[in-house]
């Protein structure tokens, strides 16, 4: 259910602010978003998988915290990321 190594490399390359950047909020939020989307597909088939649902909620919470942090630090980077990922805000 998690992202493959190649998928992670592609996402990191797309959202990295500099070469070798894996820890910026943009990269972390992008990885969490793609992981969350993949888990949502899993729940279409497995409605009663509550153990994985807890993990999903944890990832959503972590993404929310990172987005709040980025919004407080640099609103332009925040809005660009939200727009690029297609999140609701």
From Swiss-Prot:
SMART domains: Ribosomal_S15. Part of the 30S ribosomal subunit. Forms a bridge to the 50S subunit in the 70S ribosome, contacting the 23S rRNA. Coiled coil: none annotated. One of the primary rRNA binding proteins, it binds directly to 16S rRNA where it helps nucleate assembly of the platform of the 30S subunit by binding and bridging several RNA helices of the 16S rRNA. GO terms for molecular function: rRNA binding; structural constituent of ribosome. It comes from the Bacteria. Keywords: Ribonucleoprotein, Ribosomal protein, RNA-binding, rRNA-binding. Belongs to the universal ribosomal protein uS15 family. GO terms for biological process: translation. Pfam families: Ribosomal_S15 (PF00312). This is Small ribosomal subunit protein uS15. HAMAP family: Ribosomal_uS15_B (MF_01343_B). One of its GO terms (cellular component) is cytosolic small ribosomal subunit. PROSITE patterns: RIBOSOMAL_S15 (PS00362). The lineage of its organism: Bacteria, Pseudomonadati, Pseudomonadota, Gammaproteobacteria, Alteromonadales.
């Amino acid at each position: 259910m998690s992202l493959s190594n190649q998928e992670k490399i592609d996402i990191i390359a797309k959202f990295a602010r500099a070469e070798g950047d894996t820890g910026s909020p943009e990269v972390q939020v992008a990885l969490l978003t793609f992981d969350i989307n993949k888990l949502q597909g899993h729940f279409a088939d497995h409605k009663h998988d509550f153990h994985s649902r807890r993990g999903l909620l944890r990832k959503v919470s972590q993404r929310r915290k990172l987005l709040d942090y980025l919004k407080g630090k640099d609103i332009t980077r925040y809005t660009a990321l939200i727009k690029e990922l297609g999140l609701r805000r």
